[in-house]
């Protein structure tokens, strides 16, 4: 994947403002609320019975932070995303059996969270760069499935 200097700047510039714990928790909670069938992968997280329960669930919050922290690795390694996510792809495919479509859904949710938190900075050009990034990450995570 080729990244222009402008795309790299738009991605890293916004990423520097992201609160990984808060945005990660919000993104994962939104995924579980908007796409309730994704909850089956998180049965060990306890109470996911309502939006209030999901938003207040410390395991959702912790895993959301973990997910977004790992997304930060993509931002740091824009030119090597495929290898950056090789082990995570294997884990999600072989051990967790996560439907790879969920990676695309989470990417779309992350775009919404970023737009909500950084409306002024989230220009159409910024959105285009981030949309490209979440697609590349989703593809890298789904790689082991092919």
UniProtKB/Swiss-Prot annotation:
Query: Where is it expressed, tissue-wise?
Result: Red blood cells.
Task: Enumerate the Pfam families for this protein.
Answer: Globin
Write one Gene Ontology MF term: oxygen binding
Task: Give the matching PROSITE patterns.
Answer: GLOBIN
Q: Which InterPro entries match?
A: Globin (IPR000971), Globin-like_sf (IPR009050), Globin/Proto (IPR012292), Hemoglobin_b (IPR002337), Hemoglobin_oxygen_transport (IPR050056)
Q: What keywords were assigned to this record? A: Heme, Iron, Metal-binding, Oxygen transport, Transport
GO terms for cellular component: blood microparticle; haptoglobin-hemoglobin complex; hemoglobin complex
In the record, the note on similarity to other proteins reads: Belongs to the globin family.
The annotated subunit structure for this chain is: Heterotetramer of two alpha chains and two beta chains.
Identification of the protein by name: Hemoglobin subunit beta/beta'
**Source organism of this protein record:** Chroicocephalus ridibundus (Black-headed gull)
Give the gene name. HBB
């Amino acid at each position: 994947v080729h990244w222009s200097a402008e795309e790299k700047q738009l991605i890293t510039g916004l990423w520097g403002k992201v609160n990984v714990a808060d945005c990660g928790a919000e993104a994962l909670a939104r995924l579980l609320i908007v796409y309730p069938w994704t909850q089956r992968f998180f049965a060990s997280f306890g109470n996911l019975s309502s939006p209030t329960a999901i938003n207040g669930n410390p395991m959702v919050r912790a895993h959301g932070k973990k997910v977004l922290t790992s997304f930060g690795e993509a931002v740091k390694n824009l030119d090597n995303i495929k290898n950056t996510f090789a082990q995570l792809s294997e884990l999600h495919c072989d051990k967790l059996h996560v439907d790879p479509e969920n990676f695309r859904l989470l990417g779309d949710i992350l775009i919404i969270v970023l737009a909500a938190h950084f409306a002024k900075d989230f220009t159409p050009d910024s959105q285009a760069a981030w949309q490209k990034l979440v697609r590349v990450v989703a593809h890298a995570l789904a790689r082991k499935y092919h």
